[in-house]
């Protein structure tokens, strides 16, 4: 490999990871789409700002995407906090959800989208019966 090709490779590899733009159609899973009416809400933007540099660590480190949904999809199962975060690495994310939602009623859900891909929801249950928090993806091979 020539020096120029290697330099171009390094430049590409070191580019920042693109952040969530608010366009849910760009997300990697249908399960990460949010209620459209929430995208402009100040609490949604606050949460997006607080988790923008946080990643769920798996074989493919993935960002946490703010989400607001009316109902938990039937495909998802509720899991406990220790199953989602056995080493308490995501305290900052949980705290951001609590602060942005004004609720400490946090629930954890997972769904195996494929044999190698699991989608996680970490959500606060709001007074209006909506769910507000983050979604992310874990990749396991």
From Swiss-Prot:
Source domain of life: Eukaryota
InterPro entries membership: NuiA-like
Protein name: Uncharacterized protein C21B10.02
Organism: Schizosaccharomyces pombe (strain 972 / ATCC 24843)
């Amino acid at each position: 490999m020539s020096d120029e090709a290697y330099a171009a490779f390094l430049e590409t590899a070191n580019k920042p990871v693109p952040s969530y733009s608010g366009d849910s159609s760009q997300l990697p899973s249908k399960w990460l789409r949010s209620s459209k009416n929430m995208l402009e809400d100040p609490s949604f933007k606050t949460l997006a700002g607080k988790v923008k540099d946080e990643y769920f660590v798996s074989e493919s480190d993935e960002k946490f995407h703010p989400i607001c949904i009316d109902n938990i999809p039937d495909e998802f199962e509720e899991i406990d906090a220790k199953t989602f975060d056995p080493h308490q690495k995501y305290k900052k994310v949980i705290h951001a959800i609590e602060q942005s939602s004004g609720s400490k009623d946090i629930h954890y859900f997972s769904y195996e989208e494929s044999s190698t891909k699991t989608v996680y929801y970490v959500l606060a249950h709001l007074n209006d019966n909506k769910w507000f928090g983050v979604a992310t993806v874990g990749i396991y091979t």
